[in-house]
Each structure stands twice: as structure tokens, then as C-alpha cells.
């Protein structure tokens, strides 16, 4: 294994995760060529110009599960060309098996990606030995790639254990993991941080960045946000306040973000959100009005109306607080 050009030291600040805009009619099961590349370029330019530090593509709401191979490459080619080496780009390469993930990873790196955003096969859950072997195999096969691990309990049929994190920390190409951060009633973040021994950051959600940083000062250099697709200004204001040590300001932004995102989980229950997360997030992006996300792709096109309304309410609230932070960030 070799060390990639992008290292864990480069994963600081705000890591934006983007959706994959679709054309009208993309919800049809026989739709072809569904990616709106013009909207993709517009979205990426807006987000990069806002000052986001790192970009990830094709996670769950980025619809890595619904894009064809050709669509995935066309989308990421547009992202990479639009970013134009201004910030690191990690392209989503998750598939149902190791060989397809490696093939996809090689193609994405060939487009000019700085690294890969990689989840694990989930048809059957992987035990720790299989999980570590999988990531080691991908890194061995694509030695130029920096890798961000995708730790999503709902999608991958279980959380990555602290023991597995300790083994992953021995793979130099792994530069971060997309995590949730500090959670009430759980010591997983503390255990996982101890396991990786500072070799790469465990990225909390932006709405959990401040609590995670307060619990573990100096150990949380970055956080991730999909809400950048609703307008990055609130999370960029949080980033600035944290970077400048303005803790009262950071608390105020954190509270605004918590209020805006409160309706996302139906009844406050993430287990109800996860089966419909693509659709709910799509409703949020649509209501925020910052980008034109288009419809989600088949078969993830329907959800309970109340769940979609919760997502839309997040988008509306986000659009409201965004106006305040557009003005705040314009101040010297």
C-alpha cells in the first residue's frame, strides 16, 4: 500500500456531499441518460465558490444505488472538470461487490478524482475481517487513491466496529471516515476515535460538529454536510466561527441549524427516515430552492406524504436561515 497525494491532514473544515441532479422524467423505470449535467456544473460551482473545503459525491442521496455506470462516470466527470483542482474531490464508488468497486474506482481515478468515497457490499453484512479485507483490497488495487470510508449503519447493515476501525487505521490510503459524531446514549464516537489513534478524522454531521468538538477538543478537524445543496452559508458560518474560536457565534449557528433540520426524521426517529432518505432529502433540496434536484430515480420515487413534508419543511427553514448567513458571511 502507498500513501496518496491527499492525506488525512488535508481533511479539514467543511466536507460537502452533493446530490446527483436529474432531468424531468428520470423517475421512470425505463429512463435513460438521467443526469442533468448543466445543473450539476451549476451546483458544484456554487458550492465550491462558497468555500467548502472538500467534496464527496454519490453517497445515498447522491443515488449511487440508482445510477447506471455510464451516468455515474458522466456525472463525476462534470464534477471533476467543474472543480478544476480547487479542492479535493472524492467520488462515490460503492457497489455490491469488491471487483465492481475496484473497476469503478479505477475509472473514477482515471477521470481525475483525488480519491474515492467507498461504502462496503451490503447484500449480506460483512464481519470485521471481511470489512477490513474489502477496504485493503480496494486500496491495494487503486494505490493512487485516497479513501474516505462510508460508515452508515442503515445502509450497510451495521456500524463499523471500533476493532475494525483500529485495523483500518493501519491502511495509509484511508484519510477519513464519514461518521455521525457524538450521539446521546452512545460511546461509539469515543471508542472509534480511540481506535484510530488520530491517524484519520471521523467526520460528524455538521449539525453535530460543535457537540463533537466540545466533547473531544482538537480531535474533530472537519464535518460533513449534505445541506450544502440547500445553500452552504449556514454551515460555512459554523465553519468560520469554529476556525476563529468564536464559540458563542458557533453555538448560535449550531442552534439555527438544529432548528432548521429538526423535522428531517419522522417523529424524530432515524429508523423511519432511512428507508426513504433519498426521497426525503430530495424534497428538502427542492423546497430550499438553491438547486434544481429533479426527481429521484426508480425505485426510490415514493414515500409517505408526511415524511416528504418533513423534508420540505427542512428545506424551507434552511432557506430562511440561509438569508441571515449570506449577510453575515459578507461582513469582513
UniProtKB/Swiss-Prot annotation:
GO terms for molecular function: 4-(2-carboxyphenyl)-2-oxobut-3-enoate aldolase activity; 4-hydroxy-tetrahydrodipicolinate synthase activity. Not inhibited by sodium borohydride or sodium pyruvate. Unaffected by EDTA, EGTA, Mn(2+), Mg(2+) and Ca(2+). It catalyses: (3Z)-4-(2-carboxyphenyl)-2-oxobut-3-enoate + H2O = 2-formylbenzoate + pyruvate. The active site is at 178 (schiff-base intermediate with substrate). Induction: By phenanthrene. SUPFAM superfamilies: Aldolase. The keyword Lyase applies. Optimum pH is 7.5. Its EC number is 4.1.2.34. It comes from the Bacteria. It is an enzyme of class 4 (lyase). One of its GO terms (biological process) is phenanthrene catabolic process. CDD domains: CHBPH_aldolase. Belongs to the DapA family. Plays a role in phenanthrene catabolism. Catalyzes the transformation of trans-2'-carboxbenzalpyruvate to 2-formylbenzoate and pyruvate. PANTHER family: 4-HYDROXY-2-OXOGLUTARATE ALDOLASE, MITOCHONDRIAL (PTHR12128:SF66), DIHYDRODIPICOLINATE SYNTHASE (PTHR12128). Homotrimer. This is Trans-2'-carboxybenzalpyruvate hydratase-aldolase. The lineage of its organism: Bacteria, Bacillati, Actinomycetota, Actinomycetes, Propionibacteriales.
Amino acid at each position: 500500500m502507498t500513501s496518496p497525494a491527499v492525506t488525512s491532514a488535508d481533511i479539514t473544515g467543511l466536507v460537502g456531499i452533493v446530490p446527483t441532479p436529474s432531468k424531468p422524467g428520470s423517475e421512470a423505470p425505463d429512463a435513460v441518460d438521467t443526469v442533468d449535467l448543466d445543473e450539476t456544473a451549476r451546483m458544484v460551482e456554487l458550492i465550491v465558490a462558497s468555500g467548502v473545503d472538500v467534496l464527496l459525491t454519490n453517497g445515498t442521496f447522491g443515488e449511487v444505488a440508482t445510477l447506471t455506470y455510464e451516468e455515474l462516470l458522466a456525472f463525476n466527470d462534470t464534477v471533476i472538470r467543474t472543480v478544476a483542482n480547487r479542492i479535493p474531490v472524492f467520488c462515490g464508488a460503492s457497489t455490491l461487490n469488491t471487483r465492481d468497486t475496484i473497476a469503478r474506482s479505477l475509472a473514477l481515478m482515471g477521470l481525475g478524482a483525488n480519491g474515492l468515497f467507498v461504502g462496503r457490499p451490503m447484500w449480506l453484512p460483512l464481519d470485521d475481517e471481511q470489512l477490513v479485507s474489502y477496504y485493503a483490497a480496494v486500496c491495494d488495487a487503486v494505490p493512487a487513491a485516497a479513501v474516505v470510508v462510508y460508515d452508515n449503519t442503515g445502509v450497510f447493515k451495521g456500524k463499523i466496529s471500533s476493532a475494525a476501525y483500529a485495523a483500518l487505521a493501519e491502511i495509509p490510503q484511508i484519510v477519513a471516515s464519514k461518521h455521525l459524531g457524538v450521539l446521546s446514549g452512545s460511546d461509539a464516537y469515543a471508542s472509534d476515535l480511540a481506535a484510530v489513534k488520530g491517524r484519520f478524522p471521523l467526520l460528524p454531521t455538521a449539525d453535530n460538529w460543535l457537540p463533537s468538538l466540545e466533547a473531544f477538543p482538537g480531535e474533530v478537524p472537519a464535518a460533513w454536510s449534505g445541506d450544502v445543496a440547500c445553500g452552504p452559508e449556514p454551515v460555512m458560518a459554523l465553519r468560520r466561527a469554529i476556525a476563529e474560536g468564536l464559540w458563542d457565534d458557533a453555538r448560535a449557528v449550531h442552534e439555527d441549524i438544529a432548528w432548521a433540520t429538526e423535522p428531517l426524521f419522522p417523529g424524530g426517529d432515524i429508523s423511519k427516515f432511512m428507508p426513504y432518505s433519498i426521497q426525503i432529502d430530495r424534497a428538502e433540496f427542492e423546497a430550499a430552492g438553491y438547486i434544481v434536484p429533479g426527481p429521484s430515480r426508480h425505485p426510490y420515487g415514493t414515500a409517505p406524504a408526511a415524511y416528504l413534508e418533513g423534508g420540505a419543511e427542512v428545506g424551507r427553514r434552511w432557506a430562511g436561515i440561509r438569508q441571515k448567513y449570506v449577510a453575515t458571511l459578507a461582513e469582513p
